[in-house]
């Protein structure tokens, strides 16, 4: 009895180790939410930020996470005061009286 072995070697690659990359944190959706001259209601968020890149002006409150929000219904006003960016809300009644 004669045995015949047909040995075939195929290309192969050993599995590599896992990488340590490939993760990222979720975006925090920071930034300006209402633009200059835009009508806002009291309580609307104007700016979401880390730190005070924008400072609260008239009729604008600052939350615990430095979020700026409107305290009154009116129109948003962005301005520079003493080298600081300041966000204010001009009440709707004042805008009507000025026109």
Swiss-Prot record:
One of its GO terms (molecular function) is structural constituent of ribosome. One of its GO terms (biological process) is translation. Pfam families: Ribosomal_L27. SUPFAM superfamilies: Ribosomal L27 protein-like. One of its GO terms (cellular component) is cytosolic large ribosomal subunit. The N-terminus is cleaved by ribosomal processing cysteine protease Prp. Keywords: Ribonucleoprotein, Ribosomal protein. Residues 1-10 form a propeptide. Belongs to the bacterial ribosomal protein bL27 family. PANTHER family: LARGE RIBOSOMAL SUBUNIT PROTEIN BL27M (PTHR15893:SF0), RIBOSOMAL PROTEIN L27 (PTHR15893). NCBIfam families: L27. This is Large ribosomal subunit protein bL27. It comes from Caldicellulosiruptor saccharolyticus (strain ATCC 43494 / DSM 8903 / Tp8T 6331). The lineage of its organism: Bacteria, Bacillati, Bacillota, Bacillota incertae sedis, Caldicellulosiruptorales.
């Amino acid at each position: 009895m004669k045995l015949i072995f047909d040995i075939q070697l195929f290309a192969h690659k050993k599995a590599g180790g896992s990488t340590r990359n490939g993760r990222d944190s979720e975006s925090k959706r920071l930034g300006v939410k209402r633009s200059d001259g835009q009508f806002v209601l009291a309580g609307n968020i104007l700016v979401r930020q880390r730190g005070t890149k924008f400072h609260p002006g008239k009729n604008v409150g600052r939350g615990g996470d430095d979020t700026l929000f409107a305290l009154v219904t009116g129109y948003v006003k962005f301005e520079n005061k003493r080298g600081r960016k300041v966000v204010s809300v001009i009440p709707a009644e004042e805008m009507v009286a000025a026109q």
